[in-house]
Amino acid sequence: MNKVINNVFAREILDSRGYPTIEVEIELCDGAIGRASVPSGASTGKLEVLELRDQDEKRYCGKGVLKAVQAVNGIIADEIIGMNAADQNAIDKALIELDGTKNKSKLGANATLGVSLAVAKAAANSFKMPLYRYLGGKQTSVMPVPLINIINGGVHADNKLDFQEFMILPVGAETFSEAIRISAEVFHNLRSILKKKGYSTNVGDEGGFAPNIESTEEALDLIIYVIESAGYSAQSDFALGLDVASSTFYEDGIYKFEHRDLTSEELTEYYCNLVERYPIISIEDAMSEDDYEGWKLLTAKLGSKIQLVGDDLFVTNCELICKGIEEKMANAVLIKPNQIGTLTETFAAIEMAKSNGYKAVVSHRSGETEDTTISHIAVASNCGQIKTGSLSRSDRLAKYNELIRIESALGKDAKYYRGLAWVL
């Protein structure tokens, strides 16, 4: 009886870009409280569930979320007060049925996710368990490799780079804490080198630097130099990752990339060339979400060599993941809880990926909050990878710091993920 939901309350707060988002608090009959806030993306997939905004230009440039807040404080509260917070499946099923639409357009996925996450946190607190243990059980022990965004481009930055993210993966570290330490050293070395070269050291939405670099190769060469001049190897200590976000420069079947018009075949050959020349082990959204043939070609060419992550292609949706598996598109799935709208559906997407030999990468969004739930999801699911921005901006560091705490709590049971060895 103590796990029964007694009170539900939502409010409007601000995300890392200064735009409104929703925060939800759930209180149980035993006094346990769970609080969760919801992120927002800039580069979004067409088939993501709906983020409900007010569209009132007189408030927050139309981006207010009072409608979502009202949905939580009204119709959702009426439905779930009195329910058992420990039955996450039942809570999420009630939210899905209450919304009644395929894309959660009635209540908004920001409303449903805020409630779903807050309920899980309240239940975990009631059981006096850390969230990762409550969600993952006793077998939870794998600390994820972070995919750390150190150079921003695309829609995340105001520069000439078409690719959205250039990432370092500290695959050679022994522990998560060591992974963060060596990555921070590389990050600060990059800042110093950019400053010496006369580049801006301002950071983008996700905390990476956004210098006015001319080309992809120039960015990759710079990162290799920065890693090695920091005293590390770009072969054994670190590997590289890219988030291309190719849908942003895909038009009428052509990729308009660096002043060139490329077909899917030509872009695939370009990636093959990059992989030969640089220690790249992960490429996200290498093809547009609409370019299925391009995805199939790319997967056939590079799928046995590196990790090919589908974000816009899959949008954390089991139906789309299943289709991708059947048609041999990509070999990994990016997991963003706000793309699907409930915790249960998020874990279902992770399980579908893993059970079919695909890897799962838990991810933040470009508009974040100080909420650290994704850190717990990454550990609870044993998925082994997390993408949560750079080593600046407190909204990104909150996730890394929480993972350091989790590793400390796990003690000798903590195991740093080694599942990327197949691509080294």
Swiss-Prot record:
Gene Ontology molecular function = magnesium ion binding; phosphopyruvate hydratase activity
Q: List the catalytic residues.
A: E206 (proton donor), K336 (proton acceptor)
Q: Which InterPro entries match?
A: Enolase, Enolase-like_C_sf, Enolase-like_N, Enolase_C, Enolase_CS, Enolase_N
Report the Pfam families cross-referenced here: Enolase_C, Enolase_N
How the cofactor binds, per note?
A: Binds a second Mg(2+) ion via substrate during catalysis.
Primary residence = cytoplasm
Tell me which NCBIfam families the record gives: eno (TIGR01060)
Q: What does this protein do?
A: Catalyzes the reversible conversion of 2-phosphoglycerate (2-PG) into phosphoenolpyruvate (PEP). It is essential for the degradation of carbohydrates via glycolysis.
Q: Which family does it belong to?
A: Belongs to the enolase family.
Specify the protein name.
Enolase
Organism expressing this protein natively: Wolbachia pipientis wMel
